Amino acid sequence: GTMMTGCIEGSPLYRVAWFFADLTEGSFIAALPASIGMIIMGFVAAALERKKSAHAGTGVAGNGHIFTTMFVTTCLSLILGQLLYGGLFASGWIPTFATVLTVQVFVIFYGSDLKKVATSLILGTIVTCPVCYALLYGIVSPLGLPLFIAVSAGVAIVVPVCSLIFRLMPWMTIPAPAEGANPTDQNKSKFFVHQIFGDIGQLTIWGSSWATIGMYVGGIISWVMNPLHPAYGSGNFPLLIM
């Protein structure tokens, strides 16, 4: 499409568009307004979770205390992925989105200490993209399988492999779990509805009901402006959110 052509040509505008699309690619929306809505509401949810507000919904799955670090690290991984592997755009695809699923998990698991975050960012980004790319062209494409299998299988390989490597690094210790928001403080019926939205984005959008709602609102705005913008130009966005 137009975005891929622009990325191949090295257009900064389309590279930025690709960056934002990566943030909601896990939900198959991959649209700028959807990503912006998700980001805004993700920060709102994190703030409400930290305050233990009854309106927090699912918060950000108990990670409000490190949410800013999670988000910044995720963004840096997407930028680093483009810098390292941008030459692969010419092949028609680059799996930068996969680092959203790996680097973010490492930050949640190992904590927000600067040295740990830097290690998670660098190793996670360097390893994830090549593994997913190799799976795509070595197995997925030859067998005619859906592209997303390369990402999901790649993540399933990268997370345990990197975790084993981290064991060799003395500073990559696992911190004691922090206290998260208590869902019993909320109205049970309201929390049930929030949990449905939270489950949709359990891995890619922080398990946050508010972030998911923000993503859907942004996606709808994008679809109204151009029905072929969200959902990879398939025109199936209404079916995707139903």
Predicted feature residues:
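Short, Lys/Arg-enriched, Gly/Pro-containing loop segments at transmembrane-helix junctions
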Residues: 171-182
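Pore-lining transmembrane helices
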Residues: 1-169, 186-242
